[in-house]
Structures are given as structure tokens and as C-alpha cells.
């Protein structure tokens, strides 16, 4: 008989340092990760020099193979390059940068720095032109005035509001420099579940300080707004978007903001979702609300990013609701409104099909919202390289205007000819942790988002190769195995958490770990709403004949592909179909065995990550090596925890055995259900507060 669930502790970091001292091998000096991929993140100050000029001095010209770097001083505006594009031309060993603005020159200098730091040399007659794919490349911070970060796993907020405007921390400019190095040009400073105080004069003066710091790096600031701000801040009786006093208040507030921050970017809005106020409170539409804000911003060039993350507890299928609410409003939004759509139709799950809303709006600007923070993928305890997930979404074809109407093309504005409103957003994984992201390898996701926003055609391999070389070493004996490990990590996470299209099977406690049995105050917050495990099978029936007909929100040929169980991809089959436990999969296995073996693959891959990391120990400083090792061990244990919880729970319905050639559960279902993880939505669990597992 098993004893009750144990708790495990970690001491790998100290072990790593001891191992280093006994091995006799020369290893890099300890590195706390604060410098990110920049080598030295500290900002060099030089009186009278623009940021691009300072970065030009930072380029290792010898490593690059250049004698000098100059800038085209003709003063002629190159229309083809626009305000952010640049070209680099090398004649002999002289490099010339052509760009129209200081921001574009800065991007060019970071391009050259990246080349040098990655060991690439510039050759005679080298010529490259770079123009960003998306006009708006924006980070979304879910930071609160009290310094908590919703779904934040890297400490507290980077923004110390209680110190501003008087005290300015060096991290603010370091943050701006890091973002400029990867092409980010905007940041939303506060949580979409917005505190109305962020629009008060007191806080606007604080925001101004950050805007002034970010401006030389080509970064504009944006704010999330509370739709009920007129009531909260001005004491109006209503926030009805068609009320003349409400309209007047917003016009005056926006004018006030631009008087303080002349290049303010605009607003991000979460309305009528998860308890947030919105225009529907007054019988108005999303378009009514968005347009009121857009009209106030229009004279100043600002934009509204209106989130499509809406769902109601009474709906039989949460995945359908964004299309149901927004498609009828197509063509009704102002031209400076962008509908911000999560990559999938539910909520940042390890794997979802792309949101069908991307292909349903023909005369409305749309943008993608990716989640860089790992809300459902192990927080900052798990190593999961997310670019393959995002690229899977962007490369997906909506078929809205026939073949080639990819999510990337839709959100860049190419499908409907409005590239001036192309936009993409990423919910950050940044906090005041010394390494910024809570996990040293999670920095790759911040880096990858920026590089993808600049050029979505870049491969996951290329971006990761760049990041590893700049952050650790360019030695191929390190880069190749670690790259292989990280490239496999997203698929491994899907396998050990929610394979074959399963989704929303997590614990409600901070969204960490499994909880397929969890109950909640709303049915659409309960895992059973999604997995629908029962004696007759498992999976959500979204087919046209027997289900919710969510497949009809996709254009052909996707509608038929997903609707037919014979053609539906295995990796989404339980997203679209409810199948019997003995259903024969394409592999020839029963569905039950396919689940068992897929979980097992994820478990073994997570264990393999530990071995890979141990094999490159000599290339990594002891500090980062030890911290990453601790977390990889926990990740492998969590993989077992996920498998045990889901398969033992589902076994109640299937009445089938876990195959003998799979690793067997280490805990009973009762033990797992009795475990209580007590964390908030603003933290990741400590490694010593999680279920004990033995790695064989």
C-alpha cells in the first residue's frame, strides 16, 4: 500500500558547482542570465549620440570582417524601405547602412551585431534588405499596479509604479534595448483586466517616464483600459459608448494622454469577458464600444486593439463564441480598430487548431495574440520552445480567399490589402526575476516572438540557432544537441500533457499540473466540459451531424477534413470528435492504447532532455547549468504526474489496462486527487512543493 504523496526538494545547483570544481574542466564563469542574448545588456551612455550610433560602436567589427560601418547621409527618403526597413551594403570591407529613421538605423545595427555575435562574417558585395512584416509588433504585459503579474512566472512586475516617476531603474532601458534588438516596436504596460487608475493623471505621469525611456529605441507605449473608467474616474452614472457625456469624457481623456505622451500608441481592450465591463452592459455591440474609443484616438494616430476573447457559461461550445459574436459585426469597425484574436479558439492550450475567426472577417482588421508566458505549458518550470506552436498557427491556411490565405497573411493585412494595419501581439513572460523570464531557456521565447514578428518566414531552427549562439556559445557541440532538445520540447509537452487534441485538462489551481476531475463555479471552466470522458468514449464532438458544428466555422477543405474522422489529423482528433475507447486509430492501435503510448513518448522525451543537458555541461556555466537541470528534472517528474492523473482518471471510464511496456503509475488516483497545490494566478509553484516522483 502506498504512503501519501511526498514532496521533493532540489539541490542540483550546488551539486553542479561541486562537480565543476572536481572535474578539472574549464567552464564558463557563472552567469545569472540577466544579459539575455546581448552579451552585455547594460546601456552605454554617450552624450550627443543616438541609440543607433551607440549600437554601431558595440558591433564587433573585427568579428564581422568590416573595417568601418557608415550610414547613407544623402537625406533622400527611400520609399521602399518605409520608416522601419533598412538595407546593408558591403563594398570591400566598408559597410553602408541605408535607412530613413533612427529606429531603422538601430535595427540595422542590431542586425550587424547579431551577425558578428553568431560568428557570421560580412563579405564583399554583401547586400541585404530587411522590412518588417508586421507594422505593429507589440508585447502585452499583464502587470497590475500592485506589482503582481497575472499568469506571470518570473517574479513581480518590472514596472515599479510606487517608485515612478521619481526613481528610474536601469532595467527599464535594458528592457527597451533588448526589445529593439529583436524588432519589437510597442508595449502594452498593464493587464487587460485593467485597473481604471492607469488612466488617471497620477499614473499617466508615471507612464510618461517609461515612454521617454523607450522612445529612442523605437518603442511606443500602449495601455489596457477599463471600459468602465468614466464611472470609476469621473463618477459618471454610465459608461454607455453612445452616451454623449461618456463620449466627451473619452475625447478629453485621450487628448490629455497625448498632451503628456505625444507618441502614445493607443489602447488594448478586454470587454464583456470574464467579468470585465463592456458595451454589452448597455445593450451595445463590440463595434459600438471599439468605435467610440477609435474615434477619440483617430486625430492623434492611435489604434484600438479589441480582444476577441469572449465566452459565456451558457454556450454549448466555447470554441464557437468568438465567431458568433464578431462575424455579424464585420465591416462595422473603424479602420483604426484591430480585432486581437488568440491563436486558438479556446485559450492558449498546448495544441489547438487556429481560431476560425481569422478567416471569417473580410472587412475588419485582425491580429494574432500569442502567449509567450507558459500559462498552460508548465509555467517557468518547464522548458518549452514555443516558436513551433506560433508558426504552426501563422502558417495555417484559412482558405478565406482560396489557397494562400494563411493566418500570417490575414494578420499582416495582405489578404484584404491593408498592410498598414498588420499587427501581432505576444503576452510576455517578463518579470523582475534576475534572468527576466524565470527560466533561462524561456528567454528563447521572448527572442523568438520578436524575430517572428519581424519576419514570420524565419524557421524555428534558424531563430533558435541565433539565440543559442548569442546566449551561450557558438560551439556546434553545444548548439546542435540543445537545439534538437528545444525544438522537440513543444511536441513533447503536448504528448505528456494533453495529446490527440485533448484540451483544458489542467488544474484550476494556478493552471499548473493536471486536474481532469476539477469542478468550478462555471461549467466552461471545468475540464469535463472539454474532455467529456465517459463509458462510451472521450473527446468533444464538434462535427456537423452529431456535434456542435464548430467545423462549419472553417472554410473548405478544412471543414470536411475536420468533420470526417477518417481524415481529421490525429493530433486534433479529440478536439473535433468524441470517440469510443476501442476506436481504431491510424496506427492500428485502439484509442486507449494510442493515448497510453503517446503519453509514454512524452515522458521518455522529457527524460531525454535531462540527458541532453547533462551531455553539454562543460559548455555552460555552473549557475545556469544547475538551475536549468533542476527544472528539467521537475519537468520529467511532471510528465509522469500528468500521465498518471489523466490515464488513471480516464481508466475509470475505459476499464482498460495501461500496456505493460509503458511505465506504470507511481501513485493512485485517490492520492493524486487529494494533492492540493495552493498557488495564485501570479506565481509558479516552487519545485519542492510538487508531487514526488522517481525517475528511473
Predicted regions located by residue number:
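Catalytic-core regions of glycoside hydrolase
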Residues: 163, 201, 235-465, 475
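Short, well-ordered secondary-structure micro-motifs within conserved domains or adaptor modules
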Residues: 52-83, 95-98
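Bacterial N-terminal signal peptides
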Residues: 9-18
Amino acid at each position: 500500500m502506498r504512503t501519501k504523496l511526498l514532496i521533493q526538494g532540489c539541490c542540483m545547483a550546488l551539486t553542479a558547482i561541486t562537480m565543476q570544481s572536481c572535474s578539472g574542466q574549464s567552464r564558463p564563469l557563472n552567469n545569472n542570465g540577466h544579459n539575455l542574448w546581448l552579451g552585455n545588456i547594460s546601456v552605454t551612455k554617450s552624450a550627443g549620440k543616438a541609440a543607433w550610433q551607440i549600437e554601431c560602436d558595440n558591433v564587433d567589427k573585427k568579428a564581422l570582417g568590416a573595417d568601418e560601418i557608415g550610414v547613407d547621409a544623402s537625406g533622400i527618403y527611400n520609399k521602399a524601405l518605409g520608416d522601419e526597413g533598412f538595407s546593408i551594403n558591403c563594398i570591400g570591407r566598408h559597410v553602408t547602412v541605408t535607412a530613413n529613421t533612427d529606429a531603422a538605423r538601430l535595427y540595422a545595427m542590431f542586425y550587424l551585431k547579431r551577425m558578428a555575435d553568431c560568428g557570421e562574417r560580412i563579405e564583399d558585395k554583401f547586400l541585404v534588405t530587411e522590412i518588417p512584416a508586421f507594422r505593429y509588433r507589440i508585447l502585452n504585459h499583464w502587470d497590475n499596479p500592485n506589482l503582481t503579474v497575472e499568469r506571470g512566472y518570473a517574479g513581480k512586475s518590472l514596472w515599479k509604479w510606487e517608485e515612478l516617476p521619481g526613481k528610474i531603474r536601469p532595467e527599464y532601458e535594458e528592457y527597451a534595448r533588448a526589445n529593439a534588438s529583436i524588432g519589437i516596436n510597442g508595449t502594452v504596460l498593464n493587464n487587460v483586466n485593467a485597473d481604471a487608475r492607469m488612466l488617471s493623471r497620477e499614473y499617466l505621469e508615471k507612464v510618461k517616464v517609461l515612454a521617454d525611456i523607450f522612445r529612442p529605441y523605437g518603442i511606443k507605449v500602449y495601455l489596457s483600459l477599463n471600459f468602465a473608467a468614466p464611472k470609476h474616474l469621473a463618477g459618471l452614472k454610465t459608461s454607455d459608448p453612445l452616451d454623449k457625456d461618456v463620449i466627451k469624457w473619452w475625447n478629453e481623456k485621450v487628448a490629455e494622454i497625448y498632451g503628456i505622451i505625444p507618441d502614445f500608441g493607443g489602447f488594448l481592450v478586454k470587454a464583456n469577458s470574464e467579468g470585465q465591463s463592456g458595451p454589452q452592459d448597455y445593450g451595445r455591440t463590440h463595434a459600438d464600444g471599439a468605435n467610440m474609443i477609435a474615434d477619440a484616438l483617430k486625430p492623434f494616430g492611435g489604434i484600438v486593439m479589441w480582444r476577441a476573447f469572449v465566452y459565456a457559461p451558457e454556450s454549448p461550445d466555447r470554441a464557437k463564441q468568438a465567431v458568433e459574436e464578431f462575424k455579424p459585426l464585420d465591416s462595422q469597425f473603424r479602420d483604426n480598430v484591430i480585432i486581437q484574436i488568440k491563436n486558438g479558439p479556446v485559450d492558449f492550450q498546448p495544441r489547438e487548431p487556429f481560431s476560425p475567426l481569422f478567416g471569417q472577417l473580410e472587412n475588419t482588421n485582425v491580429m494574432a495574440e500569442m502567449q509567450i508566458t507558459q500559462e498552460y505549458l508548465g509555467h517557468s518550470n518547464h522548458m518549452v520552445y514555443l516558436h513551433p506552436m506560433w508558426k504552426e498557427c501563422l502558417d495555417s491556411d484559412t482558405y478565406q480567399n482560396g489557397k494562400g490565405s494563411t493566418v500570417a497573411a490575414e494578420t499582416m493585412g495582405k489578404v484584404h490589402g491593408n498592410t498598414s494595419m498588420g499587427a501581432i501581439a505576444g503576452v510576455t513572460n517578463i518579470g523582475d526575476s534576475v534572468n527576466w523570464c524565470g527560466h533561462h531557456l524561456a528567454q528563447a521565447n521572448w527572442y523568438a516572438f520578436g524575430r517572428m514578428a519581424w519576419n514570420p518566414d524565419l524557421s524555428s531552427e534558424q531563430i533558435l540557432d541565433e539565440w543559442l549562439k548569442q546566449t551561450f556559445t557558438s560551439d556546434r557541440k553545444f548548439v546542435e544537441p540543445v537545439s534538437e532538445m528545444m525544438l522537440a520540447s513543444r511536441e513533447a509537452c503536448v504528448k505528456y500533457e494533453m495529446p490527440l487534441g485533448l484540451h483544458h485538462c489542467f488544474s484550476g489551481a494556478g493552471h499548473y499540473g493536471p486536474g481532469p476531475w476539477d469542478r468550478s463555479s462555471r461549467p466552461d471552466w471545468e475540464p469535463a466540459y472539454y474532455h467529456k470522458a465517459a463509458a462510451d468514449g472521450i473527446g468533444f464532438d464538434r462535427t456537423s451531424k452529431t456535434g456542435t458544428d464548430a467545423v462549419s466555422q472553417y472554410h473548405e477543405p478544412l471543414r470536411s477534413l475536420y468533420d470526417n474522422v477518417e481524415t481529421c489529423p490525429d493530433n486534433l482528433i479529440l478536439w473535433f470528435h468524441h470517440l469510443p475507447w476501442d476506436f481504431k486509430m491510424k496506427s492500428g492501435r485502439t484509442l486507449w492504447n494510442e493515448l497510453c503510448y503517446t503519453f509514454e513518448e512524452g515522458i521518455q522525451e522529457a527524460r531525454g532532455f535531462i540527458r541532453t543537458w547533462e551531455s553539454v555541461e562543460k559548455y555552460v556555466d555552473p549557475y545556469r547549468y544547475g538551475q536549468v537541470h533542476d527544472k528539467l528534472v521537475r519537468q520529467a517528474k511532471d510528465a509522469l504526474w500528468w500521465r498518471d492523473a489523466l490515464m488513471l482518471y480516464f481508466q475509470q471510464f475505459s476499464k482498460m489496462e495501461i500496456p505493460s511496456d509503458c511505465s506504470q503509475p507511481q501513485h493512485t488516483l485517490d492520492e493524486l486527487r487529494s494533492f492540493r497545490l495552493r498557488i495564485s494566478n501570479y506565481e509558479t509553484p516552487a519545485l519542492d512543493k510538487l508531487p514526488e516522483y522517481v525517475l528511473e
